[in-house]
Amino acid sequence: ANKIIRNAIDSKDKNTDNFREFTANFYSRGLFKVKEAPEKILGQSLGDLGGGLDSTRTGIIYLSETVSEITFQKKPRNFKEKIIASKVSGSDNGISFNRAEQANFDFYGNTVFVAESNLVSPISDVAFGYYTFILEGSFYDKNGRLINKVRVLPKRDNDRVFSGFIYIVEDDWAIYGIDLIAAGKQ
């Protein structure tokens, strides 16, 4: 796994240039999960947030899923999205995760800006200081390319990092996909 990640880090510039424009299918899921919510905030009762909290005052209070087709061009910047399906559960209070453009994250940089925090990319130049990598397996995509599935594990609990999986194309060392969640203290 370390060799795969090193190759992906070494190929970042090449792969960023190769993806000046693309079309892709996009799926996103966003949720707000609350742990141990207080009874009141600034003297105002929270209740059970519309039935989203259990007896320990923990629960998912908002869930949004979207499937869309996106087209992206880097220069000049152009982004188009056609939403195929969208489902929202809970009160959004004006907040929505239903747009792909809001999730336009660049993992080829050293950090990824998520929810007001810069998190260390798994293929950052300093990734090995923050992550442990484990090769979980490989598979061939429909174009016959070998895809490596690499588990991404934070080394420390308090770092602003991700946890999950990154998929890297063999020989090109490009990111094929990600399945990551923000981890650590944000």
Predicted regions and their residues:
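Structured extracytoplasmic
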Residues: 2-147, 152-161
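Short, ordered coil/turn segments that flank beta-strands lining enzyme active or ligand-binding pockets
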Residues: 142, 170-171
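Hydrophobic/aromatic beta-strand elements that line small-molecule binding cavities or substrate pockets
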Residues: 164-168
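Hydrophobic "anchor" residues
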Residues: 174-175
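Short aromatic loop motif centered on NTY/YTY
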Residues: 183-186
